[in-house]
């Protein structure tokens, strides 16, 4: 399985070369997970799967453009701009790949899903943006070849907001390593926040690499290709 990380910029202004584009992952040039930039559709994917509908994962949301490519479209909940969206209620198959949804806590008003993507005995987990993953959902995760997750905040705890009994926001890179490393051989990071650009990208990537212990940590750049 070949994975191209199309963009690594979070919901911030562009500040460095190689970290300009928003979120998108191209699987074997066949399936697109998230469409943070309109140009990603130039890859002519056979299907699109959304983790959630924030604008940096769904480019058409700010301008309220209809998103109507003539291919299968999947997401965690209905959206007025995607009339043909298939709502995900459990494991499904598309283009020969098996997707297992993992509920993820991220937004206050939007539902979010990560996905375990399987083919030919290889397993990839794309988390989307993460405030937290419940223990019961972590328990559903099998051994993985690769995780791709976010790096909005380098500090432990990230930035978590609370409203009544709900949390939302982004947890920190150290927390994600602790949550995900028991399941994976490698963890790749993208969706960088402002912290990443306070130094040079090379220095910030070294900050991530310095947290490496038993699991390989991979700070990504726009267009990075990984294979499992």
Describe the role of every protein-language-model region:
Residues 39-44, 91-96, 136-142:
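Short amphipathic alpha-helix with an adjacent loop that forms part of the alpha/beta core around
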